Design a protein with these regions (language model features):
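Short alpha-helical catalytic segment bearing the HExxH-like zincin motif
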Residues: 26-34
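Histidine-centered, transition-metal-coordinating active-site segments
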Residues: 1-25, 39, 43, 48-288
Length: 288
């Protein structure tokens, strides 16, 4: 399977923002929005106790842009300032609050649909070509669908992704790795700044310590998870929730733009069921 990384995601987000706005500062803000993503990405949010919002690493965005002479020179050459591009949250086409649709959510949803769920590129193009910029309930720009049948295809892919993002396997693996990184910090094997290099660097540090190396190799042997109401004795287990990412896009109807859940009862029911999971169960590793 091809690997998606923050760089690819950022390029795609910027391209989508440019496609719908032709605004340079919005597009560059989209390009740079993940510049502060650390090694293992959202695992560090779990390490920071920010597993419900998953925004803890964004605080370094402005500093990382400002500390790059090359980026600052390019911004100046383009007539842009640091304030123009250091926070993509201010541009609703680039980013907005869930369950709205933005370039950020659109990019990773379509990317995962293709690389993880093997959705054909032609289908992704049908989805993308159906999207336009409209005004939402608060009269703010938002990406919308022109046709309900295309919105239906997109939302089924989106919901499948949402379930994957908070699956027992995902939550457990994120928390287990976060706990391993926490132990590495406690043993003075790595620092916070080490996390802002890359995964091979962090892994090399883990392998440099016999205790952590054994834990890392054990982590790599995990093939799945088991779950139950009771915590098994003598077994590492977690009971943890996570940020539920979901999309309920606007779709054009004869009555104007409406949220898809108001025009499609099946999706409304499935989305409600997804949101109802309280993660009230213990999860532990399964090995071959």
């Amino acid at each position: 399977m091809c690997i998606r990384d923050s760089y690819t995601h950022s390029l795609g987000t910027a391209a989508i923002v440019w496609h719908f706005t032709h605004d340079l500062k919005q597009s560059v803000a989209g390009l740079l929005h993940d510049i502060a993503t650390p090694a293992f990405a959202h695992v560090v949010d779990f390490l920071n106790g920010d597993h419900m919002r998953q925004e803890s690493t964004e605080s370094r965005t402005r500093m990382m842009i400002a500390s790059s002479p090359e980026l600052m020179a390019l911004l100046d050459k383009s007539g842009l300032t640091l304030d123009d591009v250091d926070d993509y949250h201010r541009y609703p086409i680039a980013d907005n609050d869930s369950p709205r649709l933005s370039a950020d959510r659109l990019e990773y949803t379509l990317g995962n649909a293709h690389l993880v769920f093997h959705c054909p590129k032609a289908e992704l193009k049908r989805i993308f070509d159906d999207i336009f910029v409209g005004k939402n309930e608060e009269n703010v720009d938002e990406l919308c669908f022109a046709h309900a049948d295309i919105a239906d295809i997109f939302t089924q892919l989106s919901l499948r992704q949402s379930e994957w993002f908070v699956s027992d396997e995902d939550r457990f693996s994120m928390q287990a790795l976060a706990d391993l990184l926490r132990e590495a910090r406690q043993r003075n094997v790595l620092t916070v700044d080490d996390l802002y290099l890359d995964e091979p660097h962090v892994i090399a540090l883990l392998l440099s310590d016999p205790v952590l190396a054994a834990r890392w190799q054990d982590y790599r042997r995990i093939t799945g998870t088991q779950s139950g109401a009771q915590k098994p004795e003598g077994t590492y287990a977690v009971k943890i929730a996570a940020k539920k990412r979901s999309i309920d896009p606007l779709v054009q109807t004869s009555d104007g733009l409406r949220r898809f859940t108001t025009v499609n009862a099946d999706y409304a029911s499935k989305l409600a069921a997804f949101r109802a999971d309280d993660f009230d169960r213990w999860v532990w590793a399964k090995y071959e």
